Amino acid sequence: MSYSISQIAKALGAEAAGNLDLTVTGAAEPGDAGHDQLALAMSPKYAEALAKGGARAAILWPGAAWQAMGLEAAIFAARPRLAMAGLTAMLDPGQGVASGIHPSAVIDPSAEIGADVSIGPLTVVGARARIGAGSVIGPHCVIGMDAVLGEGAWLREMVSIGARATIGARFIAQPGARIGGDGFSFVTPEVSGAENARKTMGDQGEAKAQAWTRIHSLGAVEIGDDVEVGANCTVDNGTIRNTCIGDGSKLDNLVHVGHNTRIGRDCLLCGQTGVSGSVEIGNNVVLGGQTGVVDNIYIGDGVIAGGGSKILSNVPAGRVIMGYPAVKMDLHTEIYKAQRRLPRLLRDISALKKAVSKPGPSE
């Protein structure tokens, strides 16, 4: 696969200069780029390494003096990471899944398979499942009964889609993703110590030890268009209503979404984030890595949570939060600074106590 500088610039909607017919076969960091690779030197700090590599062409920032860098051609990207999105889409070689349906795949006769669908080895497709046209299903996947998968889906190896799940177009699931497991719902015959402790903020009361009884999941999972889930990501079925993820949302590796939770459009949930059950998350919310969200709360549109935040109460729209418990980021910074001063403050207090308690000459 090779592209000319002209083709790449046109695809990216970017300006280019120099030998626009020069072709490249891949991309690389500036210091590692070979003769036929496009160097990614999108800011001056990266361009310094161009001399260590052999690239003849590079993606640079607007106005860069490309000829002084010894290049034969250059593409100018106003927004580098957006250019990366387009470039990597052009150069992605894929995962090598063969076209057609592998002979070892087990497909129920009542399943509906769209046109140009590829299904890998040892994949199982359940009764009445529907797979949209142009989808690619990798090896060892499971698509449960009555599940619906939209057009252009891309399931990597060992992905499972539970029964009755409904998923929109262009869904992408990385290896080991699990959509539609049962929710983590259990109850005791009488009020438990955990319930008392939560209600009283620490007192278990007289609750006795009891066994847990399972609450079955009658709901399913409903996912919109253009959603992506990372490796080993899990999304649980709803108890009665469906667990929902809106159009364009992206879930990183090891993200967990609990039963009944509803996530809006274009949200970003970073690695190891855990969302408890029955949470309402608005649109365009960003939860940094290892964020924890307690159950039965609301997070408004446009909220951003710093990595490691623990969200224990409702968050109004547009707020930037951080910490455990999560508070406004500027307040968290003030608290952190105050904590850093505590040892010195305690030493000062100790010294003052000694000074005022020491008898004076007149005493």
From Swiss-Prot:
InterPro entries in the record: Hexapep, Hexapep_transf_CS, LpxD, Trimer_LpxA-like_sf, UDP_GlcNAc_AcTrfase_non-rep
The name this protein goes by in its record: UDP-3-O-acylglucosamine N-acyltransferase
One Gene Ontology CC term in the entry: membrane
Disulfide bonds: none
Function: Catalyzes the N-acylation of UDP-3-O-acylglucosamine using 3-hydroxyacyl-ACP as the acyl donor. Is involved in the biosynthesis of lipid A, a phosphorylated glycolipid that anchors the lipopolysaccharide to the outer membrane of the cell.
Keyword Transferase found: yes
Gene that specifies this protein: lpxD
Positions annotated as active site in the UniProt record: H259 (proton acceptor)
SUPFAM superfamilies listed in its UniProt record: Trimeric LpxA-like enzymes
Pathway: Bacterial outer membrane biogenesis; LPS lipid A biosynthesis
